Amino acid sequence: MPVDSLVGKTPESSAGIHGWGAYVPVYRIPTREIARVWGWPDHQWKALDVYEKAVGGVDEDSTTMGVEAARNAIARARVDPASIGAVFFGSESKPYAVKPSATIIAEALGITPVTMASDLEFACRAASEGMRASIGLVASGVVGYTLVVGSDTAQASPGDVLEFSASSGAAAFVIGPSKGAAAVFESSFTYVTDTPDFWRRGLKPYPSHGEGFTGEPAYFHHIESAVKGLFEKTGLSPGDFDYAIFHQPNGKFPVKVAKKLGFTMEQVKPGLVTPFIGNTYNASALLGLVKVLDVAKPGDRILVAPFGSGAGSDAYSLIVTDAIEEAKPLAQPLEYYLKRRIEIDYGVYAKIRGKLVVRKL
């Protein structure tokens, strides 16, 4: 469908992505190193299809990474930061329990003081909530532009299976009117239930997971339901999309859910990120979207389906416009951050991520 004929046909089509950006820390720890330290057999960690994960430095947290990703998004959007009317920050690993990170990001980028700013919560789907809210704010004319940031320095208990994948990274998007957007939203659909698959209680450093709930009842059920709901709402089918991106808790799940929904590996592979940097939680599916936007061509149709434990999934259909070609070179692509790496061992990883606790005798 030509973009001009799309605009105004759905509520979502009045909004689009003007800028996108990524940030991934330079440090990497191979999953084989984690397995070596804890004695995991090869077949268990290799089954996850995660080769190494990104590790935030001692001076990096979800907010600092969010600022870096947002700078790239704003550079591509070519908008005055002061014109951004709302900032949404989605994270499971905020540096403060009580103090918004969205205001820190807004202040650092010159967006404050005349703006809305909120930290959102819905496990790995929090940033996607911000994207859905942004579509409504922009399409209704309440604000001209919004900034959506998904960023995490994901936690995992030492020796837990989550430690193979829980990683660090950030993605950001400037959402604005469809005119001039690099990609226009065609439609969206959300599906949520109360499912106890993954949680972290207050004052606890590491999350818990109900292993029997993490697969079919949570991840697969919710993503499949959201995507099928989008198909029913729009009349689209897998063959109508050039790219398909799903939340990536590991390298295995997104490929499996894609096949179950009828997508091919050719549609999925360009957006896979987790095998190379691990699961960046709120940035997981969104970094996949960044990776695809870095290479997409005008007229391409993109499906993206983030997921958050607890549990829920959104499904979006976007159509790329001619404006994408001018925006691409204005910031570093995700591939730059994927290739920029310093390998570390478990000792360095444990030290910089605060896993070592020293007690005085």
Swiss-Prot record:
Key words of the record: Acyltransferase, Isoprene biosynthesis, Transferase
Binding site for (3S)-3-hydroxy-3-methylglutaryl-CoA: C124, S165, T214, H247, K256, N279, S309
Catalytically driven reaction(s): acetoacetyl-CoA + acetyl-CoA + H2O = (3S)-3-hydroxy-3-methylglutaryl-CoA + CoA + H(+)
Cross-referenced CDD domains: init_cond_enzymes
Pathway named in the protein's UniProt entry: Metabolic intermediate biosynthesis; (R)-mevalonate biosynthesis; (R)-mevalonate from acetyl-CoA: step 2/3
Top enzyme class: transferase
Signal peptide: none
EC number, UniProt record: 2.3.3.10
Keyword Disulfide bond: no
SUPFAM superfamilies linked: Thiolase-like
Positions of CoA binding: K252
Active-site residues annotated for this sequence: E92 (proton donor/acceptor), C124 (acyl-thioester intermediate), H247 (proton donor/acceptor)
GO biological process: isopentenyl diphosphate biosynthetic process, mevalonate pathway; secondary metabolite biosynthetic process
Sample GO molecular function, one term: hydroxymethylglutaryl-CoA synthase activity
Keyword hit for Manganese: no
InterPro entries noted in UniProt: ACP_syn_III_C, HMG_CoA_Synthase, Thiolase-like
Family designation: Belongs to the thiolase-like superfamily. Archaeal HMG-CoA synthase family.
Subunit structure: Interacts with acetoacetyl-CoA thiolase that catalyzes the precedent step in the pathway and with a DUF35 protein. The acetoacetyl-CoA thiolase/HMG-CoA synthase complex channels the intermediate via a fused CoA-binding site, which allows for efficient coupling of the endergonic thiolase reaction with the exergonic HMGCS reaction.
Free-text function comment from the UniProt entry: Catalyzes the condensation of acetyl-CoA with acetoacetyl-CoA to form 3-hydroxy-3-methylglutaryl-CoA (HMG-CoA). Functions in the mevalonate (MVA) pathway leading to isopentenyl diphosphate (IPP), a key precursor for the biosynthesis of isoprenoid compounds that are building blocks of archaeal membrane lipids.
Alphabetized PANTHER family for the sequence: 3-OXOACYL-[ACYL-CARRIER-PROTEIN] SYNTHASE 3, BETA-KETOACYL-[ACYL-CARRIER-PROTEIN] SYNTHASE III
Protein name per UniProt: Hydroxymethylglutaryl-CoA synthase
Species in which this protein is naturally found: Aeropyrum pernix (strain ATCC 700893 / DSM 11879 / JCM 9820 / NBRC 100138 / K1)
Phylogenetic lineage: Archaea, Thermoproteota, Thermoprotei, Desulfurococcales, Desulfurococcaceae
